[in-house]
Each structure stands twice: as structure tokens, then as C-alpha cells.
């Protein structure tokens, strides 16, 4: 059975791993004669992948990993809003529409964010990579163009993030939010804008966007936390997953990739 990392995580936290018919912890001791059952059902709609023909920029691939330079605007995953035009469906088409296809992104980028995304080709590889997130063996850095110059020009933003409310997609800085830390460094100043290099220590939704906006320097073109700039950044904003240093989970090879967006030059 092929099971996604998110399905396993959901089953773990929602009591859908059973030992002899009773909810069990993942570290529960199993004895001969015990029956273990697992319900992978997730509390979200299931979308059947459809081929989406898109010329993908793929800087790295082997039998277990696929690294894609995602364009923007493009949804990372299919949804009710984007059932066809998604990276998920583009990868499905690129791989030849294999039967039983399971999409296993290790990191996700917002629709308006471009850059390097890592996709595992099997569940074991995905699990290994998820365990490496935010360690020196899996280092990802971003470039952002901001409205305004962050002060100080280098530092750590350590501010908890929470959903604005149950119905909103916006996030906000709030004391009762999830811990969130972002390292940043201004690498260039261009009039009233700054080119900023960032590294996530945690992985909250919209983390970079919310943290930069909290400094009074939203990402250029960010319609949620700043000002939309449709002529300069149509359908997207100036945020890009630009640098990746990755230890291959199977071969231990060190993979180093760069993707520099045109607006940062």
C-alpha cells in the first residue's frame, strides 16, 4: 500500500492506528498474534490527478528524488480552486501518468512563490527527507524583494504565527500562535526596496511573508500582506526558493543547487 506522509501523520494524531481494535501509539509494543490496522483516510477532498502539460525545469532527478524549479503563479498541489493547473498534475504528466501515482512534496511553495521544490518518488524517501527538514542536511534559503529596508539589516525574527480567524487564509503575529523563526540578511538596497536572503528555522504557513510584513517591509507584490503589483509581478510576488543544500537520504551525496530569479539581478 502506498501512503503519503500527510496521511500517516493524520492517522497518528487522529487515532486511526489501531492495535487489536483499539487506538495505539506508534511506539506501542506489538506481540505475536496482535492485529494492527490503519485507516489512511484524510479529512480533505481527494483529487484524482489529471495530466497538466507544462515544460518543467528540473535541475536534479534520480530514482528517488525529483527537484523542480517551480514557476509562479502555479499551485503546488491540486485543490478545488486549482483542480487542473498545478505542479502536482504537471509532475504526474512528466512521470508518464503512472498508475497509483502519489504526489509527495517534501516542501511546498505558495502559488505566488517560485523556486526549488523537492518531491520524493516514494514514501520511504519522503519520510527520511521530512525528518531532515530545518537541519544542516536540508538547508533551503530564499530571496525576497521587500518594500522598505528591514532594520536591523541582519537578524532573527522570532515571532509566533497564528491564523487570523477560522475562515481566513491570512496569518498574523500573535502570542498564542505557533513558534516561528526566520533568519534574514539584507544583501542589497535598491532605492526604497531591499533584496533579502532568508532561511527558515521553522516551517509555518506564509512564514516569510508574515515575518517580513511584521517588520514593516512586506514582500513586493504580496496582495495579502502588502500591495499587489500586477504589472511588475503578475499573479505572484517577489519571493523565490533560491538555494538548496541537500544530503541525499540514500547515497549521502551532497546536492547543491541555485536558482536565481531575474528580478533579483
What do the predicted segments below correspond to?
Residues 1-11, 56, 175-181, 188-195, ...:
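Pseudouridine synthases involved in rRNA/tRNA modification
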Residues 1-156, 160-165, 189, 263:
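RNA pseudouridine synthases
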Residues 16, 108, 183, 241-243:
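Extracellular/lumenal ectodomain signal focusing on beta-strand-rich modules
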Residues 18, 104, 145, 185, ...:
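Conserved beta-strand segments that form the floor/walls of ligand-binding pockets within enzyme
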Residues 68, 157, 171, 194-196:
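Generic recognition of long tandem-repeat/solenoid scaffolds
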Residues 167-176:
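Short aromatic-glycine motifs in intrinsically disordered, low-complexity regions
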Amino acid at each position: 500500500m502506498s501512503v503519503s506522509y500527510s496521511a500517516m501523520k493524520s492517522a497518528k494524531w487522529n487515532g486511526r492506528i489501531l492495535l487489536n481494535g483499539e487506538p495505539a501509539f506508534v511506539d506501542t509494543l506489538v506481540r505475536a498474534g496482535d492485529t494492527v490496522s490503519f485507516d489512511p483516510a484524510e479529512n480533505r477532498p481527494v483529487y484524482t490527478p489529471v495530466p497538466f502539460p507544462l515544460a518543467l525545469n528540473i535541475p536534479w532527478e534520480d530514482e528517488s528524488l525529483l527537484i523542480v524549479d517551480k514557476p509562479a503563479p502555479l499551485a503546488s498541489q491540486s485543490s478545488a480552486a486549482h483542480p487542473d493547473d498545478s505542479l502536482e498534475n504537471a509532475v504526474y504528466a512528466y512521470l508518464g501518468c503512472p498508475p497509483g501515482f502519489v504526489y509527495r512534496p517534501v516542501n511546498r511553495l505558495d502559488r505566488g512563490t517560485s523556486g526549488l521544490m523537492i518531491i520524493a518518488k516514494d514514501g520511504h524517501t519522503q519520510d527520511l527527507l521530512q525528518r531532515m527538514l530545518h537541519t544542516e542536511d536540508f538547508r533551503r534559503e530564499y530571496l525576497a524583494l521587500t518594500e522598505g529596508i528591514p532594520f536591523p539589516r541582519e537578524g532573527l525574527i522570532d515571532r509566533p504565527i497564528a491564523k487570523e480567524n477560522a475562515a481566513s487564509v491570512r496569518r498574523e503575529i500573535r502570542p498564542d500562535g505557533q513558534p516561528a523563526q526566520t533568519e534574514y540578511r539584507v544583501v542589497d538596497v535598491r532605492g526604497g526596496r531591499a533584496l533579502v536572503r532568508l532561511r527558515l528555522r521553522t516551517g509555518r504557513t506564509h512564514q516569510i511573508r508574515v515575518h517580513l510584513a511584521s517588520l514593516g517591509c512586506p514582500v513586493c507584490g504580496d496582495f495579502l500582506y502588502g500591495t499587489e503589483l500586477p504589472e511588475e509581478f503578475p499573479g505572484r510576488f517577489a519571493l523565490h526558493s533560491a538555494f538548496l543544500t541537500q544530503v541525499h537520504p540514500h547515497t549521502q551525496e551532497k546536492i547543491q543547487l541555485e536558482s536565481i530569479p531575474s528580478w533579483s539581478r
